[in-house]
Structures are given as C-alpha cells and as structure tokens.
Amino acid sequence: GTPITAELRGLTVASDQHLGSGDFYLGDSSLMLATLQLNMGDKPAVLAKNVSQFGSLDEAGGLLGGRFGYDVGMVSYDGKDVAGMHMLWTAKNFDASAVQSLIELYRDKVAPVQHAQAANEEAPQVALTAAEEQRLKTDLEKLLSAKPQIALEKYSINTSNGEASLSLHVDLSKPASFELPQPELAKQMIAQLDAKLSIDKAVIGDGIRAQAQFDGQTDAKTIEDQAAMLTEMGSGMALGTGLLT
C-alpha cells in the first residue's frame, strides 16, 4: 500500500489525575499538538493545526461523570484550508461499580476475541456461563437504575463560509423487564432522545470543493458548477426540515 508518514510538532501533555474506585482515574488530562502533518506517497500533505484532546472524569456518590472532547483548529490540503472540527461528549450518572464489573467481563470474554482477530488467529467463541449471564443482567439493571445520561453536546465542522453541527442527548432508564420484545425494550430503556442537525448552506459547496481537491481535480469552472448544482440539490431536499440555515 501507499506509505504514510506522520510529523508531530509542539506536543504538550498535561495530567492532574488520581485513582478513584476501581480502575478509574479521576481528574483532568489534555494533549495538544501545534501541528500534525500526514504525508501519503506522492500526494500533497494533509496538515492539521492546533489539535487537542481533553477530558475530565469525576465520581460522587458512587456515580461517574465526565467531559471528553477533541478540537482541530484547521485542516489544510496542499496548502489550502479545508475546515476545522470540534467535538464534545458529556456523560453523567454512570454507576461506578456496575461499569467496573462490565469492563472486567469485557476483558475476560470479548477482548481475547478481538486480539485474536487482530492477529489473524482463530478467535475463541464468546460463551457466558449461567453465573456470568446473571452478573451481566445484574450489572445492567444497576447501571440503568441510576438513569445514566450521555450526550454529544456538539460536533461541528467549520469552513470559511459556515458551520455544520450535530448534537445528540440520550437519557437511559431501567426497563420493567429485559425479557420484553426488542421494540418495547428499547422504548423503555431510552427515556429521552433529542437530536439536532444544522447545516449552513454554504458548507455543502465547501465540502464539494474539498472533495474535488482531494480527488486531484483542477478545472475550476467544473468544480464550481458541481458545487453550485449539489448545493441546490441539497437545499431542495432539506426544504421544510429546518436543517439548512
């Protein structure tokens, strides 16, 4: 395949954490890069500026909560700016003991299968004993009884002409029984689901231009014609939905 090399500059790592219950490290951590450059064979380089990853985890009353995010100030290709990116997740009311138990069960049963598959080896079968099945059920009941919440607070892509953003919030709850039919089980487990998608019209055209750039197209008029046509098509499909602004 095409060789890929990466050049990292201006790496800064910060951590203020301590071990809480189980295997959870509580506190804040961050990683920042001034630039990350990817070189792929004879193609133009992809350059990401002001890249950061950050997170915080806290525990109170046996419940875990946290914030985790990623930022990319700007991605450029062949010296031309394409877009920046921001993503922020939050989580709260996750029972620490239930999460710890589920992680341990995952390590014992699922991780060996994934490791074998990654090494192109014959993977063992995932089989739970009666005791493990009961443990899984108990852990899930305990987890959902705490009414955990998880949210993609914002995922956004920003170009020079606008922004496309997505947010998603999910509240979970314990169902009356795990033996319910799948549709009813899902309905009872998801207490609330809110999602919002918003796209500035100009971002569609920016995306088309970026794709043309990645594909090596050089005819400016053809690229602009494609961008205009697909922008109008996307606008027409989104009429009345409130997605485009």
What are these regions (language model features)?
Residues 1-245:
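Glycine-rich, small/hydroxylated-residue low-complexity segments
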